[in-house]
Structure formats: C-alpha cells, structure tokens
From Swiss-Prot:
<dbReference type="InterPro" id="IPR002302">
    <property type="entry name" value="Leu-tRNA-ligase"/>
</dbReference>
<dbReference type="GO" id="GO:0005524">
    <property type="term" value="F:ATP binding"/>
</dbReference>
<dbReference type="InterPro" id="IPR015413">
    <property type="entry name" value="Methionyl/Leucyl_tRNA_Synth"/>
</dbReference>
<dbReference type="Pfam" id="PF13603">
    <property type="entry name" value="tRNA-synt_1_2"/>
</dbReference>
<dbReference type="Pfam" id="PF09334">
    <property type="entry name" value="tRNA-synt_1g"/>
</dbReference>
<protein>
    <recommendedName>
        <fullName>Leucine--tRNA ligase</fullName>
        <ecNumber>6.1.1.4</ecNumber>
    </recommendedName>
</protein>
<keyword id="KW-0648">Protein biosynthesis</keyword>
<dbReference type="InterPro" id="IPR009008">
    <property type="entry name" value="Val/Leu/Ile-tRNA-synth_edit"/>
</dbReference>
<dbReference type="GO" id="GO:0004823">
    <property type="term" value="F:leucine-tRNA ligase activity"/>
</dbReference>
<dbReference type="InterPro" id="IPR002300">
    <property type="entry name" value="aa-tRNA-synth_Ia"/>
</dbReference>
<keyword id="KW-0030">Aminoacyl-tRNA synthetase</keyword>
<feature type="short sequence motif" description="'KMSKS' region">
    <location>
        <begin position="602"/>
        <end position="606"/>
    </location>
</feature>
<dbReference type="GO" id="GO:0006429">
    <property type="term" value="P:leucyl-tRNA aminoacylation"/>
</dbReference>
<dbReference type="Pfam" id="PF08264">
    <property type="entry name" value="Anticodon_1"/>
</dbReference>
<dbReference type="InterPro" id="IPR001412">
    <property type="entry name" value="aa-tRNA-synth_I_CS"/>
</dbReference>
<dbReference type="InterPro" id="IPR013155">
    <property type="entry name" value="M/V/L/I-tRNA-synth_anticd-bd"/>
</dbReference>
<dbReference type="InterPro" id="IPR025709">
    <property type="entry name" value="Leu_tRNA-synth_edit"/>
</dbReference>
Amino acid sequence: MNQIEQKWQYIWQEEKAFEVSNASSKPKYYVLEMLPYPSGKIHVGHVRNYSIGDVIARFMTMQGFNVLHPMGWDAFGLPAENAAIKNNSHPKKWTYSNIKNMKKQLKSMGFSYDWSREINSCDPEYYKHEQKFFLELYERNLAYQKESFVNWDPVDNTVLANEQVVDGRGWRSGAIVVKRYLKQWFLKITDYAEELLNEIQNLKEWPEAVRSMQEKWIGKSIGANFHFKIKDNEETTIEVFSTKPETIFGASFIGIAFNHPIIERLVSKTPEILAFITQCSHITRSSELEKAEKEGVFTGLFVTHPFDSNIVLPVIITNFVLMDYGTGAIFGCPAHDECDHELAVKMNLSIKQVIKADMDVQKTAYTEDGILINSDFLNGLTSNEAKQEVIGEFEKLGIGKRSVNYRLKDWGISRQRFWGCPIPMIHCEICGIVPVPYKDLPVTLPDDVNFDGHGNPLDHHPSWKHVNCPKCDKPAVRETDTFDTFFESSWYFTRYCNSNATEMTDKKACDYWLPVDKYIGGIEHAVMHLLYARFFTKVMNEQNYVSVREPFKGLFTQGMVLHATYKDEHNNWLYPEEVVKKGNEFFHKESNNRVVQGRIEKMSKSKKNLIDLETMQEQYGADAIRLFVLSDSPPEKDLEWSASGIEGCSRFINKLEYMFKAIDSLKDDVNSEVNKELNRLVHFTIKHVAEDIKHFALNRAIARMRELSNAISAEISKDKIDVKTVRHGFNVLVQLLNPFIPHITEEIWQKLGNKERLYNLSFPAFDESMLELDTYIMAVQVNGKLRDTYEFKTSVSEDEIKQVTVSLPKVQKFLEGKEPKKIILVPRKIVNILV
C-alpha cells in the first residue's frame, strides 16, 4: 500500500494537481484548516482535522469549484524557546527542522494542499508585513502601551505565560510567582466590541456554541457608573460600575480590587492588608479569582451613601472584584447578589432586602428582578423602571451616568519572550516612544543569542537592542517585547490569497477568495483566535487591505481524538504500544506486570496516550487512517481511537482491490437479468453521499458507500450477474470514495483503463427517475397490531391496496368473518384495519 501511496503523491506533485489560479471562470471555494504549530510531528488529532478539510476540498473541486486549500506554519511560540534553552541552540533551527518533518508527513497523508502558497510566520518576509500593520494601528491610536499586571518569576527574572504557572509556581524555577506591573503593548479591540457583538448574529454558518461563547466573552453589560464620597475626605471619591444600580438602597459595603489605586493613596497597609494583597496577587488567572472562596479585608475607609449621608459603608478589599472589569470597584448588595451575600455572611455585614421575594434573603440571595421595597423614591417600581429612575437621579446630582461595559478587554500583545515577532518600536530618553521607520522593516531577531533560561535574551543581548533614535539620532533602545503569537494567526488566511504579494495582502486576490468559505478547527479557539481574526479583518478592511469585514463565512469545529490512558504499578504513564491485553486485563509488554487502564481522554504527550502516525502508516497506510478518522464518529463528535476500527478500514480497502480483480475478470452476459435494485442503489448513493458531504455527515456518507460496495459484492457472487450495472456501480463507488481515500481509488481507476485522473473528474451524476422503486412493502395491521406484510407495485391504487390486504389469509384469521369498520392508510408504509 505504501508504494501505491508514494506513487500517487509523486504524480500529484509533478502534475501540480492542487495548485490553483486566482484567475478562473469557475466559482471559488476557499476551505482552510487552522494552521499547525510545528511541534515536530503530526498527531492523529491533526490528521482528523486535515482529513475533514481534504474531503471538502476534493469534493468541491469535483463539484466544479476553483478550490483554494492552502497550508502553512504558526511557527513562533514558547515550545521552540524551551527547546532552545534545553539544547542551547537557536529556536530557528529547531523550528525549521520540525517544519521539514511535518511537511513530509502531511504530504505522505495525501492531503490536497496548494504548497505553492505555503506561509511560515517566523519568516521575516511574512512578519515584516505585520510589523508595518502594527505601526499603522499605532498611528490610528489602536495600539498603545500601559502598565499591566504580569506573572513574574523572581528567580528566573522573567515573565511567565499563564500556562507556565503550575500550582502558583514557575514551571522551571519552582519559585512562587507574583503579580508585577510592567509596561505592556495593547490593541484596542474594545473599540470594535459592539460591532463584534452585533455581527455574531450574521454568522449563520457558525456553530451556535461558538457564537454563544463569543457573546459571553464580549459580555456586554448595561448599567451605571457613579461615585461614592470618602467619609471625612469628600474631595476624593470611589467610582463604581453596577449593572443593578436600582438596588443602591440595599448597599452594605464597597468592594474594591486588591490592586485598586486608592489603596496606594489612602489605605494604611496593616500586616493583614499586605498579606491579603499578596494572597490575591499569587492567583494568576481571573477565572481563579472568580471561583475562589469569597474573602475580604477592611481598609479602614468608609464612604457615604449618595442618597443619604447618614448611611456610611465600609470599603473592603475583596478577592472577587477585578481591576480590569468596570472600574475595579462595586457596591455590595448582599440580599441580591451571591458573591456579595457570601462575603457579607463571612464578615458579618448587614443584608437588606430591596426587591420583593418569597424567600429569606438572610439565607440566600434573591437575584431575580421584581418590585422595589425599602428603597425610598424607588418603592413600588419594577426593577427596570427603578434602574431608569435612579440613573436619572445620578445624572441630576452630577455623580454618575448610564454606561455600557464589556467583559472584553483590550488585547495585551506583549510577550517577554525571544521567539516571536519583534515589536517595531524604539524607546528614546529624549523623544519617548518612536516607531521604527517603514524603510527599516523588518526588525529581525539576532542569530547570536545565549539561552540560559534567565530573563528575555533580547533584553540581555549586547548589541541588538542598542540603536540610534530615528528622530534625534541619539542613543536609544529597541522594544525587547515580541508579539503574542495570536498576532500572526489573526491575518494569515489573507496571505494565502497571494503569498508572494509585496504588500501585506494582494487586494485583488483577497477580493476573489475572501471570505473563507469553510474554516475548520477546534472549539478551544472560539474566544481567542477566532475573535482576534474577526477584529483584525475589520481593521484590515479600514486600511484597505481587504474588502470583507468578516473573515470566515462558515466554521466547522471537529471533535477531539481520544485514547485510553495506562499506568504501571509505580503510577507512571505508559504508551499504548507498551501495553498488551490478555483477556479482560492489561499487562506491560516487557515486565508482564499488571497495568491499570485509566480514563479515555484527549490524546496528550503528558499522559502518553498517543498513537505514532508513522507506525500506523507503515502498518495500514494513509488511506486506512483517513478512512478510520472519518468513519467511526460524526466529525463534530469526539472519536475514540481503536485498533479494531482501523483494521476494519484496512480490510475495506483490501476488499476494493479484490472487487476490482473480480469485476475485471467478468465477461458481459447479455442474457443476465438487469438488477434494478442495484441500479437504483447506485443513483441513490450518488445523491445522498453528495448531500452528506455538504452537511459534514462524513461518517454517514462512508456508511452509504460501504452499503453500495456490499450490494456490488453480493451481485458478483451470483450465478447470473448484471455485469453492466456492476461495472457502472463500481466505477461510481471508486469516484465517490476518492475524496476520502484518494491513493487507492486513483490506482484502481487507472487499472480500470481510465486515462483522466480522478482529481480532475466531476462528481458522478444521478438520474432522479432511477430513484423510484417499482415496488414497496407495506406493514399490514389489524387493530394496530402487525399481522402481515405485502409488496405492492408503485402503480397500485388505494382501493386495490384495501382489497388485497383484507383478503390476506393472516388478516382473515383476525377478522373472524367481520367486516372492517375502517381502513387507515399511511402511504407506502402501513395499512391499519380496524374491526
């Protein structure tokens, strides 16, 4: 099988089978799988993703479309830098070696990529365009620098990504990670929050789950911003944001984030306060803060109620108010908010009910809307009426106004890493921040770098960062941060339209190809990559790089590939190939010690539940792997890897070769009867396989083709064979299977004597008239119970059906000589005789 696959891969390469032109009279179709990170090896999860895309690409080509199906590499990132530290070598060497190997693997799977459009995000010829784009954003005030919290490893003296913080400690040093303010670069994605939110409803071909996740991530909240005066210091106020300002008369405290600026200005830092701030700063993710047990510490400050100066509220530092949401301060209404209630119970704060409820708010917060009580001028109003009224009062008093807040925050793009695209800015003591002139782009990474694992190598480099200021020509320093790698993947799909364009995009080519018709990838990218790509497309549209404002017309999110996990007696993870099954138990192949089978989980390096692709290819071939990952489960569902499943797919491919040999040896028999049912099934399969592929029901399409192959095999085994229909049916079967298993089908097609390649052929056509059955079978019931079945010709009338079924011996037995009261017909399905 490997020889056949290599043969066709060579032919496709020599014939440039999948290279497409930007100038074609055919309608366009752009199918794209999310580009991979070059980690070194393609894994089975990749194969499933790319096999889905390949079926769609090949099918749409057969449907007469000019199909763009490109591939490239998301090549910057932390793993390359970690490998550089480990091996004391440049990450470029590691990355390019991995790309070479993975490209070879992708070609060996027979994927129909247009490799002439390949992109590599760590190539200066690629990232010079995004450096220029960043400068354009800066000119439009869409890029800016400010201080922000980062995860700081005090031993390695470096910033850590969230995934590098394990149980609150640095992954390399083991040091307790702290929050630290550093200057970071941001993009103003929040300027586009409303458009990003509103246009979600137009993404009709996106999964509802992804659309919902983006809506929640953007998180639009309508409420009010207003001020509380500090008691005994009325010149100073704390501004809060609330989505429920109508509950103001239920306020019992002010909650502020642990890093709220007023703490530095007015709060005396007692040991208790310092300890609490430190505790909060060790939590590295906002999601962890939100899930944590609600805690707080009193600051010693009080504020006065905006509508009653006799009411004073304590100001409390909490671990659930976040500085990057709203204003970093809230008023706590424990009776009507769960977080506030939990803290109030713990700190013995008052719980005052201000919305009618048939429950005890001292025990549980009532969080629904209702009628206001205990609320002065708001009493008797509905929640919505009270909200409008109280905001009006804030505006009259000049202490607040209606406001809209978004959970979405500006995108922090700074990474204190080496292996990324350099941010093209210069810091001058005289001129401040100065953009690198366009003529000096790209700013490239140095080759002579020391990777000792401590700090950012760019910051420590003896010469790279030192440069003269473009404005005053005095000594200055380069920005040593690099772009978040999501920067590269937020526009790469536009580059495929013409990967040799001298500018960021070829506008004419983008006008032809964009938007991407079908984008395929994991749902884990719903609120990061997919949102950033939508944001970039809108800005690129305004910069006249593209005409569209949405990048992906259709989105398909495939399920994960799963495998059982195994551990030995010492609790060490084992690879599947190290384990053998004997009866219902598992044992280590070498030691023969008992092995414990764990949960079936997503394949991962850490748990070693991986399948080596190259081993599988040697054993079964690429076509069998492709067929298995597409046939065993709907593409949107998770797929459990099974040896028996891929063996079954391998047998099916071998069966196709056997069928070819058997059919090739047949001689025409003019006396054989025409197998109308087989002919009908051929046309039925053509029609429904096309529909299944269009709806991504690829496993169902494969099941239909297996059914057709079984019917052809059954006909071959007869004494009198309808050779003409068998040959036609087999030809159709080979064509239908080609998008799924392209190597063996091209080989069989050639052996059948065909000169043209399958990849150049149109999808088989079906004849609608052939789908009609000459006969059909109806269930015959008496008083709703099945008593017989009968085969009728399609031309029979309802009266004839009634006469025939009533006279059937098995029916007569239950009629007992009585006349039917009524006969109910469900056309072509059921006759129900009532007596």
